[in-house]
Amino acid sequence: MAVQKHTVALFLAVALVAGPAASYAADAGYAPATPATPAAPATAATPATPATPATPAAVPSGKATTEEQKLIEKINAGFKAAVAAAAVVPPADKYKTFVETFGTATNKAFVEGLASGYADQSKNQLTSKLDAALKLAYEAAQGATPEAKYDAYVATLTEALRVIAGTLEVHAVKPAAEEVKVGAIPAAEVQLIDKVDAAYRTAATAANAAPANDKFTVFENTFNNAIKVSLGAAYDSYKFIPTLVAAVKQAYAAKQATAPEVKYTVSETALKKAVTAMSEAEKEATPAAAATATPTPAAATATATPAAAYATATPAAATATATPAAATATPAAAGGYKV
């Protein structure tokens, strides 16, 4: 089933200017048949003293505090501009227009960041995150038509940017449902995206405050608990789409790495894939088809939820389930992911 067309909501401000009101007499153009004796003119009233103009309200500024946060705010703004630009071109040109507009905005943001003294190390870290997000989006953009390709690209990039913003604890407006409505995803899937996204943000925040050697453990425990609490009764029964199951296995496999920070960063990358995978749910023909594609009950027991994957998979199982391609790609992407 082709990716359904997303609804792009653009809020256009329309200024309605009213003309001055005219009197009925002037409109009719009539003069009295018998002019009345004019009344004595009234004493002119003393003009009132003009009120002091109110001080214009200050334009609210962004809430970002670090250079990384300021940069991701600009990237988010570029995302919005790219969506707006793509909305006014023919379907066949949407993908190209979005990529070009977003690329220009991103490059401009990095140039401005360097001009303001943004540290090269931090820039490289954020660049790595953004590159990984763009790669995920590009891989997802496999629609049958140019517009479907654009829709898949934007939906996946949206979720990837949300995760990056969550990692950086950015308080700016995130490029999510305001502009791009992923209407083809079932309501349950949308709720799950939000729950995993919230759990991820909670875990990333907790891990950021932990010592380097404890980051992965803190992240894992916090994420597991948040998922279990948010899913409630569905915790033991919910079947994720196959792509998500594979990503969760990869996240668990990260525990086999030797360095604590490597375990944490590889897990971050894998969970980012997990969140973006859910934005591709519209590619499934039907919810039933997605359930059919879910691994066997035995495998699902170990991987149906992030917490289950962490808690029940053994090191040997993790080694067996992580595909060679994923295992090869993840460490390379992890290089710039120090949070």
UniProtKB/Swiss-Prot annotation:
Region (6 X 9 AA approximate tandem repeats of T-A-T-A-T-P-A-A-A): 285-334
Sequence repeat start-end pairs: 32-34, 35-37, 38-40, 41-43, 44-46, 47-49, 50-52, 53-55, 56-58, 285-290, 292-300, 301-309, 310-318, 319-327, 328-334
Domain of life where this protein originates: Eukaryota
Keywords linked to the UniProt accession: Allergen, Repeat, Signal
Stretches with biased composition (Low complexity): 36-58
Signal peptide: 1-25
Transmembrane segments: none
Pfam family, one: Pollen_allerg_2
Keyword hit for Transport: no
Tissue expression pattern: Pollen, starch granules.
Entry keyword annotation includes Repeat: yes
Region entry Disordered, spans: 36-65
CDD domains tied to this protein: Allergen_V_VI
Chain residue ranges for the region called 9 X 3 AA tandem repeats of [PA]-A-[TA]: 32-58
Family: Belongs to the Poa p IX/Phl p VI allergen family.
Protein name according to UniProt: Major pollen allergen Lol p 5b
